[in-house]
Regions:
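Hydrophobic faces of well-ordered beta-strands that scaffold small-molecule active sites
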Residues: 71-77, 89-94, 134, 153-159, ...
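Conserved, mostly hydrophobic/aromatic
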Residues: 94, 157, 193, 208, ...
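C-terminal extensions of enzymes
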Residues: 335-397
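Alpha-helix-loop-beta-strand connector modules within alpha/beta enzyme cores
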Residues: 118, 140-143, 148-149, 179, ...
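Catalytic alpha/beta core domains of metabolic enzymes, predominantly
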Residues: 216, 221-338
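N-terminal organelle-targeting presequences
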Residues: 30-75, 80, 84-89, 95-106, ...
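N-terminal chloroplast transit peptides
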Residues: 1-43
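Active-site beta->alpha loop and helix N-cap motifs at the rims of alpha/beta catalytic domains
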Residues: 79, 95-100, 104-199
Length: 397
């Protein structure tokens, strides 16, 4: 299935976002039912195209066809030049995207950045910091507007990670970005805003969602983050499966991780399962996204989750693996509202999450991984400002 403006998510997926830390090639991410044969280096924004199934083109059923009947598959990245082959339906704009655009002067989006740096409104800012913040906001939105012209679905905009522990500033930043989008005639229903899953970020999500502004919570590494974000009404919650697994291989002492290991479960996959069951058992509206997928079995083990961000190497393997017709239904939908209804939660897990309970429940894994993610995003934002400082004013000013 493809995401559309009528879905509860169209992201950058949703994705960043840069989701993965790889080389330096400017790229974009797609969610599709077909896989592109490119060797890619870095993910910048996510684009979600609607591509034909191999069933229609070859008459064969592949593993990819089978898994996409249960979950939205979000391939890692493809280059900008493939818009015509794989028309995107949704996208994300982020600091990493701005860095990539500035590294390629000939890209179609460079004009959007140059126009932001030429904006007279920013020149009148009271301080150099305010002026730079204005430039970055304008650049994000200008690129987002260009992307909105290319996609029928939603454009997700990353909120500065340096605001992660300040609810009011997160809300103000989103309002500022939303105002700029409105001035350029992009309606709120076309937008998502990506916010780190700190307690303050979750509170910002609660306030924004109450205004009808959709949020995408990222860096969720523990059940308390997921449950609190779901209670806040976040539209999308993203879990990084592989990063939790990596942490567990090299660390110990996290009660949540240790409990899953004692049950013989992978901590990342276990969190996705628990999060999905909680959301569906208790009627929350949030959609769940699984990222940092490391192998095909990861995909098979969480079929039924709303979105799975999957590296192209794995997707290519899924596409190249033909499934005989009599095996089509051997792929089991592991997650479903029906199975969620039978899942049991402890009394402690069913609390109305407040800041005290939230911070008490955050274990070493979630604290360390959240901190690392925030530092990475903050570094990208700082690099954008430094780069803008070097290239401002642009040649046409």
């Amino acid at each position: 299935m493809a995401l559309s403006s009528s879905s509860s998510l169209a992201i950058s997926s949703l994705t960043a976002p840069a989701f993965l830390d790889r080389g330096s090639k400017l790229t974009v991410q797609f969610a599709t039912s077909n896989v592109v044969s490119f060797k890619l280096k870095r993910s910048f924004p996510l684009f979600i195209p609607s591509a034909g199934s191999s069933v229609h083109t070859t008459g064969l059923i592949t593993e990819l066809d089978s898994v996409t009947s249960y979950s939205e598959i979000v391939p890692d990245t493809v280059i900008f030049d493939d818009f015509q082959r794989f028309p995107p339906t949704a996208a994300t704009v982020s600091s990493s995207l701005l860095l990539g655009i500035c590294s390629l002067p000939d890209t179609a989006f460079r004009g959007a950045v140059d126009n932001a740096l030429s904006d007279r409104e920013c020149y009148d800012s009271e301080s150099s910091d305010a002026r730079m913040s204005c430039f970055v906001n304008k650049a994000l939105v200008n690129v987002g507007v260009d992307l909105a012209k290319l996609v029928p679905g939603r454009v997700s905009t990353e909120v500065d990670a340096r605001l992660a522990y300040d609810t009011n500033r997160i809300v103000k930043k989103v309002h500022d970005l939303l105002k700029l989008y409105s001035e350029l005639e992009v309606p709120p229903e076309r937008l998502l805003f990506k916010i780190p899953s700190t307690w303050q970020g979750i509170e910002a999500s609660r306030l924004l969602e109450s205004e009808g502004i959709r949020t995408h919570m990222t860096f969720a590494y523990s059940f308390c983050q997921v449950a609190a974000a779901a209670q806040a009404g976040a539209s999308v919650i993203q879990i990084f499966v592989g990063r939790l697994r990596d942490w567990a291989r090299n660390h110990s002492g996290d009660p949540e991780v240790e409990a899953s290991l004692q049950r013989g479960e992978d901590p990342g996959l276990a969190l996705v399962t628990k999060a999905y069951n909680y959301i569906h058992k208790y009627g929350h509206k949030s959609k769940l996204m699984a990222a940092a997928i490391r192998n095909k079995q990861d995909v098979f083990n969480i079929l039924g989750v709303d979105y799975i961000i999957t590296p192209l190497k794995i997707l290519q393997s899924l596409q190249e693996s033909v499934t005989p017709p009599d095996e089509k239904y051997s792929y089991v939908k592991r997650l479903s509202p029906q199975s969620a209804s039978a899942y049991s939660f402890s009394k402690e897990e069913l609390v109305k999450w407040d800041q005290y309970n939230f911070e008490s429940a955050m274990g070493p894994a979630s604290v360390e991984l959240l901190t690392a993610g925030l530092e990475g995003y903050a570094d990208q934002a700082k690099r954008v400002e430094e780069l803008f400082g070097k290239i401002w004013p642009p040649p046409n000013v």
